[in-house]
């Protein structure tokens, strides 16, 4: 396993649409292991493959609270089968937009279909933080960042803040 570099805005790869995965094999599992290690090291709760420059429809996530046992999750070729009409606001952040947080309104519940770490198809309902996080990460697969849901002014402020933060580092 290896920690990979996380791309930050305005890196052009983050606007790229990720491609479906043909099969879950040892090579893909090695990528997912690297992604998980990278996410934990950041630290974060979710990471899409494109955030480390790999344009594949793969997401890793762990929503365990600090001090709890880790609960890694893997989502290959995830798709939303259904989304609730009711929405919920949630303050989001992103490893590709460091040190910036803002409220985004998303469907409160979704039904997902994806392949897991073993390549088995799973259907699952998501709500709360899980629903927010999976929608946020799935946006990455379409080349969309959470700041793209904000006004142009807020988006520009976020990018400016990230650039300023990068210069200071």
Curated annotation (Swiss-Prot):
Cofactors that this protein relies on: Fe(2+)
Catalytic residues in the record: 137
GO biological process: co-translational protein modification; translation
CDD domains documented for this protein: Pep_deformylase
InterPro entries to which the protein is assigned, alphabetical: Peptide_deformylase, Peptide_deformylase_sf
Binding residues for Fe cation: 94, 136, 140
EC assignment: 3.5.1.88
Molecular function terms, GO-annotated: metal ion binding; peptide deformylase activity
Record-linked Gene3D superfamilies: Peptide deformylase
Enzyme category, top tier: hydrolase
Cofactor note as given: Binds 1 Fe(2+) ion.
UniProt entry tagged with the keyword Methyltransferase: no
Keywords per UniProt: Hydrolase, Iron, Metal-binding, Protein biosynthesis
Family: Belongs to the polypeptide deformylase family.
Database matches in PANTHER family: PEPTIDE DEFORMYLASE
Function: Removes the formyl group from the N-terminal Met of newly synthesized proteins. Requires at least a dipeptide for an efficient rate of reaction. N-terminal L-methionine is a prerequisite for activity but the enzyme has broad specificity at other positions.
Protein name: Peptide deformylase
Gene expressing this chain: def
């Amino acid at each position: 396993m290896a920690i990979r570099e996380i791309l930050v805005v305005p890196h052009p790869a983050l606007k790229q649409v990720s491609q479906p995965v043909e099969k879950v094999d040892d090579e893909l599992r090695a990528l997912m292991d690297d992604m998980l290690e990278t996410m934990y090291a950041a630290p974060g709760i979710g990471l899409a493959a494109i955030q480390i420059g790999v344009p594949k429809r793969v997401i890793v996530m762990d929503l365990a609270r600090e001090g709890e046992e880790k609960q890694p999750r893997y989502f290959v070729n995830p798709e939303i089968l259904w989304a609730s009409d009711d929405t919920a606001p949630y303050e989001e952040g992103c490893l590709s937009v460091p040190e910036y947080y803002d409220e985004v309104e998303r469907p409160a519940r979704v039904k997902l279909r994806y392949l897991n770490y073993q390549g088995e198809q799973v259907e699952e309902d998501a709500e709360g933080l899980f629903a927010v996080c999976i929608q946020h990460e799935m946006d990455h697969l379409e080349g969309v960042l959470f700041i793209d849901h904000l006004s142009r002014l807020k988006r520009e402020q976020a990018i400016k803040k990230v650039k300023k933060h990068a210069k200071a580092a």
